UniProtKB/Swiss-Prot annotation:
CDD domains: RecA-like_HslU. This is ATP-dependent protease ATPase subunit HslU. The keyword ATP-binding applies. Disulfide bonds: none annotated.
Length: 459
């Protein structure tokens, strides 16, 4: 059975979690600390006696802030740190029960699907060495069929046996060495490969679960069957490894452990929750549906049973983190019951010019570093001066102030426009060094920034 430690909560301390988030996200320390504490509380709860553990409920978080300030990025990075089943969903994907669209219980099903997939991959990693040996033997069997030896003069199928000779063993050892050195990757072999019956079934919105069950039912029809296929060794190896791993992995244990992990350590991030909030000054049928989504979310967040194809999960101890810009609405416009289920509220700050400068230089995978590495593949050395970084940050900030504020996403637009010509010409400029300074930035973007109409459509 999968180890109990595979999906336990992350053992990182809040300080370590914040330090890890700092490597990728600039600022927003309050949000980082709240998320870090919530994540650590998952671990703390698992250390309690079982009777008390069941009484400790997660403190759900509501993150409030304009677009492009890091809400979604915090969720994305959290997924890699959590060491637990994690799913991110858009609130706008769901509709009230009775309307066309996905119902909120799909969140629970998605969480279990994620956990099962992760557990299955972990189980396959544990048997990787063993299945690679099995796959190697099957490839060698295809390359060197064993000689059939009959007993007596009348050869009967029942008395034929496979008898490797010393010469065969030497040949097999030689081919094994060639196989491991990669000399036979393009050699074609014939194999019996398991048949995977798959059907593409189109289902109406909101009935994806039924379509998935139908696909699974039809796939089971061909279970156990195999067919002969001619493949190169390079193409055959991953197929054989997957096939052998499936034989060694216990699906029942994986499903049971995945459901347990979801119930005890699952984390759900609900983005764009402000889009399902009814505005106080509007009246209309669409707002009824939005409020209905909130009411459908309520039992899920409070704690309910959700039926999935792997079994029923209880959502009582799942941590929910919701986020939204709340441009046209306020968190107080959420239905009161749902407000009470998100006791921790965190406001993320709008980004300043100084933040943009840090975003361009500090993160491990800063945008400037990404462009430098991309152009390096073409043999072009790209360098950004400090005054160039300052000017790029200033332009992004000014355009955000003048138009819609889209936060750090504006930097993507500005940099792409700035380096468009260089990216186009880079295959013909192998070996060159290009320095981007303030003059370079002004030459390529200055006119666009001065003309509000142009910047509105281009930047």
């Amino acid at each position: 059975m999968p180890s109990k430690t595979d999906f336990t909560s992350s053992t990182m301390t809040p300080r370590e979690i914040v330090q890890e988030l700092d490597r990728h996200i600039v600022g927003q320390q309050v949000a980082k600390r709240s998320v870090a504490i919530a994540l650590r509380n998952r671990w703390r709860r698992m250390q309690l006696p079982e009777e008390l553990r069941n009484e400790v409920m997660p403190k759900n978080i509501l993150m409030i802030g304009p677009t492009g300030v890091g809400k979604t990025e915090i969720a994305r990075r959290l997924a890699t740190l959590a060491n637990a089943p994690f799913v991110k969903v858009e609130a706008t994907r769901f509709t009230e029960v009775g309307y066309v669209g996905k119902d909120v219980e799909q969140i629970g099903r998605d969480l279990v699907d994620t956990a099962v997939k992760m557990y299955r991959e972990q189980a396959k990693v544990r048997v990787r060495t063993q299945v690679e040996e099995y796959a190697e033997e099957r490839i060698l069997d295809a390359l060197l069929p064993r000689r059939s030896v009959g007993i007596g003069f009348d050869v009967d199928a029942d008395v034929i046996r496979q008898e490797p000779s010393a010469h065969d063993s030497e040949t097999r050892a030689k081919f094994r060495r060639m196989l491991r050195s990669g000399e036979l990757e393009d050699r074609e072999i014939e194999l019996d490969v398991a048949v995977n019956v798959s059907m593409d079934i189109m289902t109406p919105p909101g009935m994806e679960e039924m379509g998935q069950q139908l696909r699974q039912m039809f796939s089971n029809i061909g279970g156990g069957k195999s067919q002969k296929r001619k493949l190169t060794i390079k193409a055959a190896r991953p197929l054989l490894i997957e096939e052998e791993a499936a034989k060694l992995v216990n699906e029942d244990e994986i499903r049971a452990a995945a459901i347990e992990a979801c119930e005890q350590n699952g984390i759900v991030f609900i983005d764009e929750i402000d889009k399902v909030v009814k505005r106080g000054d509007t009246v209309g049928g669409g707002d009824v549906s939005r409020e209905g989504v909130q009411r459908d979310l309520l039992p899920l967040v409070e704690g309910s049973n959700v039926s999935t194809k792997y079994g029923t999960i209880r959502t009582n101890h799942i941590l929910f983190i919701a986020s939204g810009a709340f441009h046209l609405t306020k968190p107080s416009d959420l239905i009161p019951e749902l407000q009470g289920r998100f006791p921790i509220r965190v406001e993320l700050d709008a980004l300043s010019k100084a933040d943009f400068i840090r975003i361009l230089t500090e993160p491990k995978a800063a945008l400037t570093k990404q462009y430098q590495e991309l152009l390096k593949t073409e043999g072009v050395s790209l360098d950004f001066t400090e005054d160039a970084i300052d000017r790029i940050a200033e332009i992004a900030y000014l355009v955000n102030e003048r138009q819609e504020n889209i936060g750090a996403r504006r930097l993507h637009t500005v940099l792409e426009r700035l380096l468009e010509t260089l990216s186009y010409e880079s295959p013909d400029r192998d070996g060159e060094s290009v320095t981007v300074d303030a003059d370079y930035v002004n030459a390529h973007l200055g006119e666009l920034v001065k003309d509000p109409d142009l910047s509105r459509y281009i930047l």
